[in-house]
């Protein structure tokens, strides 16, 4: 729910490096 929104916002910069972004994907 809302938690995913906040987590996604904090992971935004990491997704560029293919780090936690892969986990969310």
Swiss-Prot record:
Enzyme class: transferase
GO molecular function, one term: alpha-1,4-glucan glucosyltransferase (NDP-glucose donor) activity
Biological or metabolic pathway of the protein: Glycan biosynthesis; starch biosynthesis
Gene3D superfamilies: Glycogen Phosphorylase B
EC number from the UniProt entry: 2.4.1.242
A GO CC term assigned to this protein in UniProt: amyloplast
Keyword Nucleotide-binding belongs to the record: no
Keywords tagged on the record: Amyloplast, Chloroplast, Glycosyltransferase, Plastid, Starch biosynthesis, Transferase
An individual GO BP term: starch biosynthetic process
Name listed for the protein in its UniProt record: Granule-bound starch synthase 1, chloroplastic/amyloplastic
